[in-house]
Amino acid sequence: MTEQGYITRTIEISGRTFSVDIGRVAGQASAGVLARYGETVVLVAATREALREGLDFFPLTVDYEERHYAVGRIPGSFMKREGRPGEKAILAARLIDRSIRPLFPRNFTQDVHVVALVMSVDQDCSPAITAILGASVALTLSDIPFAGPVGAVIMGMVDGQLVVNPTLEQDEKSDLHLTVAGTREAINMVEAGAKEVSEEIIVEALTKAHAEIQRIAEWVGEIRAEVEPLGLAHPKIEVPANEPGPELVEAVRSAGYEKMRAAVHHCKNERLDKKSADRHLEGTKAEIINAVLENFPEEEQRLKSLVDKLEKEAVRELVLKEKVRLDGRAFDEIRDISVEVNVLPRTHGSGLFQRGQTQVLSVLTLGAVRDEQILDGLDTQETKRFMHHYNFPSFSTGEARPIRSAGRREIGHGALAGRALEAVLPGEDVFPYTIRIVSEVLSSNGSTSMASVCGSCLALMDAGVPIKAPVAGIAMGLIKEGDEVAVLTDIQGTEDHLGDMDFKVAGTEQGVTALQMDIKIAGITPEILAQAMAQAREARLYILDRYKEVIPGPRPEISPRAPRIIHTTIDPEKIRDIIGPGGKIIRKITETTGVDIDVEDDGRVFITAPDPEGGKKALEIIKTLTAEVKVGEVYLGRVVKIMDFGCFVEVIPGVLGLPGKDGLVHISHLAHNRVRKVEDVVREGDQILVKAIGFDNQGRLKLSKKEAMEPPAGGAGETGRPGLIQDDRPDRRPRSRFSRR
């Protein structure tokens, strides 16, 4: 222990030091630690409230708060302080929540609040991983009952090699970004984005990740044993058993077991849809409750809980013992699929995907570069050109609730589907559009996020976006009792609710592009995940084949209703020629052609035009404004001014009422013979060939008419007078400016 009264413990993870300060911060919390990974620092505090009676769920809240001072920035908002968490922060909070939630006792109903405050960010050391590990230590040291500790790592794949916790540079090159959390015994959370990585590599990465997780979890467990005698770890509180009496349990079982089994079999035999099955099962549960309630009038809440458990037992028994599902399907059977495109005629692209009673309409919009989302988070990325937004209205589940703004679930599902598609999107150099897809869930009965992947892929192809390959997604489920395991393909809502796992897999024919696993039990092994991924691949290939029946690939042209974007690159030094003083020139271009123009600092120019002609006209104007006269090139120019010492010739015409680029043809360069008067050779308005021969010391263009012409045969001059040749006197330069402004 230090003189300040706290201790620090460290462990090496992927060549960098992870440490926790214990007893240093957040003394009023149940436990608080200062977690440090490299130069990333996250304060994590865990607190609990007193027992709340009558709850049938665990009220866990996880907040992940980003502070802009962590990267030396001031927030960009008007108030100059942090507001509601951004998308990245919400996704990080969900990672922590999903890593720890399965490890609390089932009958524990006290409010638990875990706060991760990001205070310093080293881009090579993930603050999300730091927060998960900090939460693991805090919960392990607290008095909150917790079946941890938890470890977590990110797996990358750089140049074909798996890397634990890749640095920022490695992550940018990586084909895989796989976040894994778990205990010493098993994995309980997976989240991944990938570039068509094979299932075998994913399983190998999970196995390697779990080995590192076991080492970290072991270290956290040792910390508790070490600091408990010092008073820095608290005895775990007792969780009230709150178990119903044996008489009530027996009464429910006697009155309801056979009825519930019969109800479940009726749903299976009749292959009832969600509404019909729910109505039948709820009716059966009400019968059982009414039959028992008259003998136990004060036990209504426990009675309802027991009947729910009876339903769960009957459904799980059907699967494990009879090898068939509630709706009569086999374990690897997919519900009926419907695929449509071009559903909405005035949009840029749309896809309607239905699997059973899950239905999602995805709508795509193509926009200009200026439509990119501006990010104000802690990452180095400043803008985002692809957005996927997911909406889940109440009518999709048959409920009558007000529609609210997007919550954590909607943001999480939208990000997952977006991640699944990012790997196949064309680069900005090929397709310089901002892409926004909105997935509207119209009906929900399991796996709406994966239906959003399918609907969004259809919308991309319908819009003519040149994706590398079509993507499909499927949700896998698990029912596990002891050593008995059933992996289910394409789970519906009831199987999600009563099962042990929701494992979502998306990808192409070549490999996986996204993964997400939510689990309700303490963990599962890599072997079970491998089986789930193998079944998911078969389902994915089946869905991709169904796409081909309707739309075999992206349309050859983008939607006629989408804007046209023309991309060109100019010398960054020429940007001022497009912008003009106070933006005068660029405004004139947009007003004249009806286009939008975005100019990047590196010289990339994007012209967004509602019609092709306007875009072409704007491009020509920009090319003219930024054109360079090359020494040695011959130009067809127009004489714009006659002077005693020569003439000015415009070699690049002006546009939008602006002057073009001109230069001086000195009288000595008008002809091979001696010229006494400029008007003897040219007149104002004449079109003549001239050659660019250089620039004077003030950067003014010098042109030559005689060098653009063949020398006269036999030495005769243009006037036919033999023997007259160009004298060797140097050019005389007047003091007046050569270029017209």
From Swiss-Prot:
S1 motif domain boundaries: 632-706
Subcellular location as annotated: Cytoplasm
A GO molecular function held by the record: polyribonucleotide nucleotidyltransferase activity
Needed co-factor(s): Mg(2+)
Bilayer-crossing regions: none
Gene3D superfamilies according to UniProt: GHMP Kinase, N-terminal domain (3.30.230.70), K Homology domain, type 1 (3.30.1370.10), Nucleic acid-binding proteins (2.40.50.140)
Pfam assignment, any one: S1
E.C. designation(s): 2.7.7.8
Main location: cytoplasm
Reaction equations catalysed: RNA(n+1) + phosphate = RNA(n) + a ribonucleoside 5'-diphosphate
Keywords: Cytoplasm, Magnesium, Metal-binding, Nucleotidyltransferase, RNA-binding, Transferase
Residues covered by the KH domain: 563-622
Keyword Magnesium applies: yes
GO BP: any one term: RNA processing
GO cellular component terms, A-Z: cytosol
Chain positions covered by the region annotation Disordered: 703-741
Family (UniProt): Belongs to the polyribonucleotide nucleotidyltransferase family.
NCBIfam families: polynuc_phos (TIGR03591), PRK11824.1 (NF008805)
Function: Involved in mRNA degradation. Catalyzes the phosphorolysis of single-stranded polyribonucleotides processively in the 3'- to 5'-direction.
Annotated protein name in UniProt: Polyribonucleotide nucleotidyltransferase
Native organism: Desulforudis audaxviator (strain MP104C)
